């Protein structure tokens, strides 16, 4: 993965122009709450470099995965399995944010809003996930 924006407390793996944009809005919003988010663009959603992933998550205990499609069989499933296989989860918390029902139709932003994976809803979920208020 490629570091789009560096951070030190939470890492979020995502891909694609729309989701990167949403993550950068999320990063700015969370910065105001005192959280420092690292944003990673995954050019390949089904193959991962062990050394690269180790470097990305080093010293980070909260891992998020964001994708704008169905959860089952997506990057979140694959990356979570990869992390577990290589014993990289340890005490880290991991959360997958994706679409868990048949996707609604509309503009990209309308779909994100409906499924609550837009930056405002994600911020609330991440704050609860991190138990930081």
Predicted regions and their residues:
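Thiamine diphosphate
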Residues: 1-133
């Amino acid at each position: 993965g490629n570091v789009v924006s560096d951070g030190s407390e939470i890492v979020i793996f995502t891909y694609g122009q729309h989701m990167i944009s949403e993550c950068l809005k999320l990063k700015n919003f969370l910065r105001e709450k005192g959280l420092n988010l690292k944003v990673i663009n995954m050019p390949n959603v089904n193959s991962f470099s062990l050394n690269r992933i180790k470097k990305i998550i080093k010293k980070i205990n909260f891992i998020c995965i964001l994708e704008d499609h169905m959860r089952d069989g997506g990057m979140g499933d694959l990356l979570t399995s990869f992390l577990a296989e290589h014993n990289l989860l340890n005490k880290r918390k991991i959360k997958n944010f994706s679409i868990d029902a048949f996707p609604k139709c509309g503009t990209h932003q309308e779909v994100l809003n409906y499924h609550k994976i837009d930056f405002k809803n994600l911020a609330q979920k991440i704050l609860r996930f991190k138990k930081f208020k």
